[in-house]
Amino acid sequence: MQKIMHISVLLSPVLWGLIFGVSSNSIQIGGLFPRGADQEYSAFRVGMVQFSTSEFRLTPHIDNLEVANSFAVTNAFCSQFSRGVYAIFGFYDKKSVNTITSFCGTLHVSFITPSFPTDGTHPFVIQMRPDLKGALLSLIEYYQWDKFAYLYDSDRGLSTLQAVLDSAAEKKWQVTAINVGNINNDKKDEMYRSLFQDLELKKERRVILDCERDKVNDIVDQVITIGKHVKGYHYIIANLGFTDGDLLKIQFGGANVSGFQIVDYDDSLVSKFIERWSTLEEKEYPGAHTTTIKYTSALTYDAVQVMTEAFRNLRKQRIEISRRGNAGDCLANPAVPWGQGVEIERALKQVQVEGLSGNIKFDQNGKRINYTINIMELKTNGPRKIGYWSEVDKMVVTLTELPSGNDTSGLENKTVVVTTILESPYVMMKKNHEMLEGNERYEGYCVDLAAEIAKHCGFKYKLTIVGDGKYGARDADTKIWNGMVGELVYGKADIAIAPLTITLVREEVIDFSKPFMSLGISIMIKKPQKSKPGVFSFLDPLAYEIWMCIVFAYIGVSVVLFLVSRFSPYEWHTEEFEDGRETQSSESTNEFGIFNSLWFSLGAFMQQGCDISPRSLSGRIVGGVWWFFTLIIISSYTANLAAFLTVERMVSPIESAEDLSKQTEIAYGTLDSGSTKEFFRRSKIAVFDKMWTYMRSAEPSVFVRTTAEGVARVRKSKGKYAYLLESTMNEYIEQRKPCDTMKVGGNLDSKGYGIATPKGSSLRNAVNLAVLKLNEQGLLDKLKNKWWYDKGECGSGGGDSKEKTSALSLSNVAGVFYILVGGLGLAMLVALIEFCYKSRAEAKRMKVAKNAQNINPSSSQNSQNFATYKEGYNVYGIESVKI
């Protein structure tokens, strides 16, 4: 059993004499306050002081308890009754209402309460809170809702819900009723989010919140978290304290929010009370010292006034009221009711006064009648009264605005505010913009597009640059949209014409037209330095595999030619002199030895030829196919040689997103607020998820505030930073001086830029049709060519593309010179070796001949002559070419 904290406030006779006068008449008043109702208790105390009288004094006995605990309520009520109270003020909920009403009816003790009104007849219960059913049904009909969700707190009873369901059955409304009163506090945030996500799947964007302030605030927090507080959503807060909640956090979301207000702050009586209320000390009166008051606190203050007025009327009627001898046990069996309790009930029901909650009057059942409830709507400048509801007049609208909040006035009569962003080449300041005014200060793709859209739709427009320079993203903590999206969501602009990417999260809060430009995320890097050709770059036209095959083919052809020449009888012939006479020797010769075969193949490959040619058919077949082979190879080589020698190629260290993700030397990042960052954050693809993990944890941060900052970082990083941005912007910057950036790889995704309007805007259809028409006319492509390529500064091939051809430098052909010098050197070396070899051989021969002469002197002369002739023949004759 939970222990009840019992607080009895008994003011001393001296103090009460100072407050209420010198009269000793004391009227005991009970009070049952729930824990945490500090402001209500402060209002109760202020009322005790405010409505004091010299005729009698009210003496309160206060109990703070859990009103949901029926046992605690029973003990407190019986304790109050045994003290001899004349009436009890207090609160109840659905668990304790039957206990309290039963005691009141049995013991004839009047109970004045600001809690929710009950159905049926409950004697001795005076209900300070007006019934909201009639006003709520009238507001639903005013908004012409026929399909909505109804979220209710079962702790407040089900009477209002039952009335709505009865009307729904009669008028064929589609109502989704959901009880949020039993949601576990530990998981409430998650459950609220899940609830509204389920409603979104059902396209339920009209919601009634039949809850008290604290629960409404909890629900609104989660509505903001999941982005359901924007245009296109409408909420009705079904309690009497529209201004009691924290409306500031949802005020600029764009959603329509309506409700009811029982305390009219424009009323003079309320204004005077607030002046005094705001001067009270917070420590002495918790919840005071503010310029507002909760409607339950206002009803508490009014209840004190009603009790005071009732007892004053009894005094005027000279009806003596006393509890002497009547303070008994409330649990006695049989129960003994208080005999004079009926007189007090009658006096309370007959009270008619003006209070903080307006006109206070009761019917025979103790329920409020002849009251007025203000109808409120939340505007961007705060809560605003749009009308009121009363039992006689029903709903009366005093503010002539359409309930939907959409502007349907003619476009031709309105200057449309167009928000955009300074981003080349979409929107740029003209060089002489300081001398111009209005839209004339700007130029660019989107400036021309805005003019065309306005011409097709027939409206005047004003270009404004977004204040924070952002495209639009929702803050993870505050859930507030920034950038151009925020200006649309919060009603600061009518349309956004800019390079704004169409994404799911943005589509949830704003409307997009058909894409006016298709694009994707691409990689920008600093253009690498052109690679200089190598010493042997003349070998590049053919792959190394081909060169190896040519070498083997050369050797193979030479060997085959040698073998064919040896086996073919037609390749052998006798030697002839220059005058045509044959030698007297019968020996046949063959010119295609192995070295001559190699020389013949080399000469044919170099297209130079040699002095010998095959005589046999087989040898000529070998030579023919070799000539054909060399013809094709040399022609192909020559065709590619010019391109390889004159074009300086750029070697990029990065070719794709995979290359970026696999290395850490080159940093990479995106715009800090935009769709590109969202793409990586939400992507489930392994490569992109790996890139996002790196980007969000990189130090220093790889994110940049603007595209210009990202481009500057690429240019200054010396190839150590890559910037991820839309391909269209990448292509544009590549065409701008100093022409030192380039796009690498393909696009990472496919998306489009669209023109954005607020949810439900009347501009949406007109703008959409205009975009389609411009696309069919080819004007969109014409605008892109104008601002991307016609005004480009680097040409199609970069900054040096103006030169048609590049002159060959020494480095292009250095290898050829090296081979020439090497060949000459090799020839001289071989010649030296041959000379040395021949000299040594000649020395040996001369030595042998001299020795022979010494042995046979008689024949030395003839032998010498013959040797001299033979040597001359070997050196200069035909044999000099024989192997």
Swiss-Prot record:
Q: How is it modified after translation?
A: Palmitoylated. Depalmitoylated upon L-glutamate stimulation. Cys-610 palmitoylation leads to Golgi retention and decreased cell surface expression. In contrast, Cys-836 palmitoylation does not affect cell surface expression but regulates stimulation-dependent endocytosis. Ubiquitinated by RNF167, leading to its degradation.
Pfam families annotated for this entry? ANF_receptor, Lig_chan, Lig_chan-Glu_bd
Q: GO CC annotations?
A: AMPA glutamate receptor complex; asymmetric synapse; dendrite; dendritic spine; endocytic vesicle membrane; excitatory synapse; external side of plasma membrane; neuronal cell body
Impact of altering residue 302 to G? In NEDLIB; severe decrease of ionotropic glutamate receptor activity
Topological domain ranges for the Cytoplasmic compartment: 565-591, 611-616, 834-883
Q: What is said about its interaction partners and assembly?
A: Homotetramer or heterotetramer of pore-forming glutamate receptor subunits. Tetramers may be formed by the dimerization of dimers. May interact with MPP4. Forms a ternary complex with GRIP1 and CSPG4. Interacts with ATAD1 in an ATP-dependent manner. ATAD1-catalyzed ATP hydrolysis disrupts binding to ATAD1 and to GRIP1 and leads to AMPAR complex disassembly. Interacts with GRIP1 and GRIP2. Interacts with NSF via its C-terminus. Isoform 1, but not isoform 3, interacts with PICK1. Interacts with CACNG2. Interacts with GRIA1 and SYNDIG1.
Write out the similarity annotation: Belongs to the glutamate-gated ion channel (TC 1.A.10.1) family. GRIA2 subfamily.
Q: What does this protein do?
A: Ionotropic glutamate receptor that functions as a ligand-gated cation channel, gated by L-glutamate and glutamatergic agonists such as alpha-amino-3-hydroxy-5-methyl-4-isoxazolepropionic acid (AMPA), quisqualic acid, and kainic acid. L-glutamate acts as an excitatory neurotransmitter at many synapses in the central nervous system and plays an important role in fast excitatory synaptic transmission.
Q: What free text does the record give on domains?
A: The M4 transmembrane segment mediates tetramerization and is required for cell surface expression.
Q: What is this protein called?
A: Glutamate receptor 2
Organism of provenance? Homo sapiens
